[in-house]
């Protein structure tokens, strides 16, 4: 068992937990549970599914915030009838009164890799949090069957603990993807660059005469030949893929020191 995350220097920290799948999704409660020991945790998330909304904000629209029943003792929960970005803004400004230290978003059902991450409301929430000066990290995984996996929870705790470190600058931005978990478990954690790929946008005609738009990742080469060190290639090897990005221009940061601390902490948990 991995113990001893919280220290007296960070116990007072406020942690905002959000997602793009709605406040009732199991993934957000697995995430809240994983970080609950690290500080004062509050869930602020959309009322319903907001997948694919990216950094979208509800301008010129009244957005309601309602406190709802929490699924965890000691954790308050608020439902927002808006986007994940709205949830971060209203959570930090209205609920926390500009006193949020860290924002964690997820756990998203499905990878957020390559260019797909910029469509994701899960990662979009983290981008907005970073832009507002908060440290932020998005978490995603392929199959939600393992959302409550003990190792997954401890890796999230370890990464978030480093996110909260005074050594991690304000506005830092990270994206974390968990691999498909095999019988042998997770093979480790590694830094990764967003893979080079194209987006494949599909449009289906619906019975009511309207159209449904959905996306899928179109990888330019097959999984065995992916560029070494890309997020998709790291995941294909059964490892957790951690990506650091510059919150001001979203450039990939290969040598980010906080990223390397997170990788080391995750690998200590995984063993």
Predicted region positions:
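A cross-family phosphate/adenosyl-ligand binding-site feature
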Residues: 15, 26-99
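Alpha-helix C-terminal capping segments
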Residues: 91-97, 126-135
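Short beta-strand segments
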Residues: 18, 44-46, 81, 105-108, ...
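Short, glycine-/small-residue-rich phosphate/pyrophosphate-handling segment
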Residues: 137-162
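Glycine/threonine-rich flexible loop motifs
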Residues: 111-120
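Short, Asp-centered acidic motifs that coordinate Mg2+ and/or phosphate
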Residues: 102
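Electrostatically charged, flexible surface regions
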Residues: 153-271
């Amino acid at each position: 068992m991995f113990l001893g995350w919280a220290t007296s220097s960070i116990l007072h920290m406020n942690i905002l937990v959000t997602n793009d799948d709605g406040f009732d999704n199991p993934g957000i409660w697995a995430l809240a549970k994983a970080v609950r020991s690290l500080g004062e945790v509050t869930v602020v998330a959309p009322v319903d599914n907001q997948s694919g909304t990216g950094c979208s904000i509800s301008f010129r629209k009244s957005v309601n915030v309602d406190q709802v029943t929490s699924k965890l003792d000691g954790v308050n929960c608020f439902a927002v009838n808006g986007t994940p970005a709205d949830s971060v803004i209203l959570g930090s400004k209205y609920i926390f009164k500009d006193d949020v230290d860290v924002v964690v978003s997820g756990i998203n059902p499905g990878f957020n890799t390559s260019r797909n991450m910029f469509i994701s409301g899960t990662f979009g929430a983290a981008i907005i949090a970073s832009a507002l000066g908060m440290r932020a990290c998005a978490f995603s995984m392929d199959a939600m069957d393992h959302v409550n996996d003990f190792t997954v929870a401890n890796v999230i705790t370890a990464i978030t603990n480093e996110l909260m470190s005074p050594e991690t600058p304000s506005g830092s931005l990270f994206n974390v993807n968990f691999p498909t978990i095999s019988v042998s478990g997770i093979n480790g954690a590694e830094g990764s660059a967003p893979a080079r790929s194209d987006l494949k946008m599909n449009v289906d005609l619906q019975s009511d005469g309207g159209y449904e738009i959905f996306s899928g990742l179109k990888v330019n080469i097959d999984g065995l030949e992916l560029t070494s060190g890309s997020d998709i290639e790291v995941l294909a090897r059964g490892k957790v893929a951690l990506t650091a990005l510059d919150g001001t221009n979203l450039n990939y940061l290969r040598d980010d020191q906080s990223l390397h601390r997170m990788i080391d902490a995750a690998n200590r948990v995984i063993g």
